[in-house]
Amino acid sequence: MSETRAVLRGVRLSVDKGRLVADLIRGKKVDQALNILTFTQKKAAVIVKKVLESAIANAEHNDGADIDELKVKTIYVEQGTTLKRFTARAKGRGNRISKPTCHVYVTVGN
C-alpha cells in the first residue's frame, strides 16, 4: 500500500479553476484519469495532467509500482501567493491587477 506524491508549486492558475479539474479525476484509476484530462478543454487540465504523469513516473521509478493498479488517492489544489500588478488608467490613475497562483498536490497509490 505505497503512496507516491508529486507537487507543482506556484502555477499561474486560479484555485477555483484548478479545483474544477481536480474534482474530475479524484479516486479514478490513473489511465482513466489521464484519458479524462486529455479530452478536457481547460488550461488547468494540461497542468494537472503534467503533475499526474510526474506522480506516475515517481511511483514507477522510485517505488517500482505497477501502473495498471495505480489510482489517484488524493488530489488537491491550494492557494499560492497572489502576484500584484499595476495597469495605467485614464487621468494618471492606476488599477491593481491580481494574478493568482496555486499549488497542485497529487498522490497516487494502489
Curated annotation (Swiss-Prot):
Q: Which UniProt keywords apply?
A: Ribonucleoprotein, Ribosomal protein, RNA-binding, rRNA-binding
| PROSITE patterns in the record | RIBOSOMAL_L22
Disulfide-bonded cysteines: none
Query: Pfam families of this UniProt entry?
Result: Ribosomal_L22
Does the keyword field hold Lyase? no
Superkingdom: Bacteria
Sample GO molecular function, one term: structural constituent of ribosome
**UniProt entry tagged with the keyword RNA-binding:** yes
An annotated GO cellular component: cytosolic large ribosomal subunit
GO BP annotation list: translation
Q: What is the stated purpose of this protein?
A: This protein binds specifically to 23S rRNA; its binding is stimulated by other ribosomal proteins, e.g. L4, L17, and L20. It is important during the early stages of 50S assembly. It makes multiple contacts with different domains of the 23S rRNA in the assembled 50S subunit and ribosome.
Which HAMAP family does the annotation name? Answer: Ribosomal_uL22_B (MF_01331_B)
The UniProt entry's sequence similarity note says:
Belongs to the universal ribosomal protein uL22 family.
Q: How does it assemble?
A: Part of the 50S ribosomal subunit.
Q: Which PANTHER family match?
A: CHLOROPLAST 50S RIBOSOMAL PROTEIN L22-RELATED, LARGE RIBOSOMAL SUBUNIT PROTEIN UL22M
- What is the protein's given name? Large ribosomal subunit protein uL22
- Please give the organism: Paracidovorax citrulli (strain AAC00-1)
